[in-house]
Amino acid sequence: MEALVYTFLLVATLGIIFFAIFFRDPPKVPNK
């Protein structure tokens, strides 16, 4: 169970950082 909790916390942290950077300034990198 602890592995699940740590994995969830890791994903949540990465998600928060990603959204913070994403909303800080609009994406300028082309998808292709």
From Swiss-Prot:
Keywords: Chloroplast, Membrane, Photosynthesis, Photosystem II, Plastid, Thylakoid, Transmembrane, Transmembrane helix. GO terms for biological process: photosynthesis. It is a single-pass membrane protein. The chain crosses the membrane at residues 3-23. It comes from the Eukaryota. PSII is composed of 1 copy each of membrane proteins PsbA, PsbB, PsbC, PsbD, PsbE, PsbF, PsbH, PsbI, PsbJ, PsbK, PsbL, PsbM, PsbT, PsbY, PsbZ, Psb30/Ycf12, at least 3 peripheral proteins of the oxygen-evolving complex and a large number of cofactors. It forms dimeric complexes. PANTHER family: PHOTOSYSTEM II REACTION CENTER PROTEIN T, PTHR36411. Belongs to the PsbT family. This is Photosystem II reaction center protein T. It comes from Psilotum nudum (Whisk fern).
